[in-house]
Each structure stands twice: as structure tokens, then as C-alpha cells.
């Protein structure tokens, strides 16, 4: 459960990330595809090479959705309901992939915003990303 301090920490990190959603999103996906190559199976139609327009576009889409979650941090279930439906019922993404994505995003934030990602902020961001993953997998059967 996110407490008031966690929410403030997540919003503070997001203020630094928001201006870089395409760059950080693409880097997060590229890192995930490299470290967890099995995740590529969900993107058979994508050019998965470094810097591809499709990865940049999808990375931006992923982090824009994450930004919406930050903006609705007190009601993640409503904010992510449509995404949860799509990932569970249409795309049928294995829930473990959200953990992979979350880990890769944390690494990207640590690389680009090391002064912001204190141990306390790291914990808050990890809790937030876990909460997002829980909501996104809530409609799986």
C-alpha cells in the first residue's frame, strides 16, 4: 500500500521522467527485450533493433500510460481498467512480463536520474510499479 510519502516520492520522480517519456520508454523496452528475450514474442511485427521508430513509439505509449497512473495514483484501478482489459483479454500478456518491465524501468531511472533515486524513493517507485502490475493483472483468470 502506498502511503503519502510514497505518493510524493513517485510524483517527484515522475516530474523528472515526464520530459523524457519517449527516450526512457524506448530504452526500457530495448533493455527488456535484451535481458528477457522471451518478451519479444509479443511484438512479432516490430522492428526490434536499437532506435527503431516502433520501439520509440511504443515506449512512449507505455510511459505515457504510466504517467496517467501517476496522475491517478489514488485510483489506479479506474485509471488502468482499459489497459488491464486489453492486456488480459486481447493481448494475453504473461503477468511476469510486467515485473520484467518494471525492473527495466527502474534501471533506466537509476541510470538517468541517479540523484533522484535515493533508497527511499527507490522503494516508493518499486511499490508503485508493483501496484500498477497488480492492477494490470487483476482481470486475468
From Swiss-Prot:
O2 binds at residue 58. Residues 1-141 form the Globin domain. GO terms for cellular component: blood microparticle; haptoglobin-hemoglobin complex; hemoglobin complex. InterPro entries: Globin, Globin-like_sf, Globin/Proto, Hemoglobin_a-typ, Hemoglobin_oxygen_transport, Hemoglobin_pi. Red blood cells. GO terms for biological process: hydrogen peroxide catabolic process. Heme b binds at residue 87. Involved in oxygen transport from the lung to the various peripheral tissues. Belongs to the globin family. This is Hemoglobin subunit alpha-A. The lineage of its organism: Eukaryota, Metazoa, Chordata, Craniata, Vertebrata.
Amino acid at each position: 500500500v502506498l502511503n503519502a510519502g510514497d505518493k510524493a516520492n513517485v510524483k517527484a520522480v515522475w516530474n523528472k521522467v515526464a520530459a523524457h517519456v519517449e527516450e526512457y520508454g524506448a530504452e526500457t523496452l530495448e533493455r527488456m527485450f535484451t535481458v528477457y528475450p522471451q518478451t519479444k514474442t509479443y511484438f512479432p511485427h516490430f522492428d526490434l533493433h536499437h532506435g527503431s521508430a516502433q520501439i520509440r513509439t511504443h515506449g512512449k505509449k507505455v510511459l505515457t500510460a504510466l504517467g496517467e497512473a501517476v496522475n491517478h495514483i489514488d485510483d489506479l484501478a479506474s485509471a488502468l481498467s482499459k489497459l488491464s482489459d486489453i492486456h488480459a483479454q486481447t493481448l494475453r500478456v504473461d503477468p511476469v512480463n510486467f515485473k520484467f518491465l518494471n525492473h527495466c524501468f527502474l534501471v533506466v531511472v537509476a541510470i538517468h536520474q541517479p540523484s533522484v533515486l535515493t533508497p527511499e524513493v527507490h522503494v516508493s517507485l518499486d511499490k508503485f510499479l508493483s501496484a500498477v502490475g497488480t492492477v494490470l493483472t487483476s482481470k486475468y483468470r
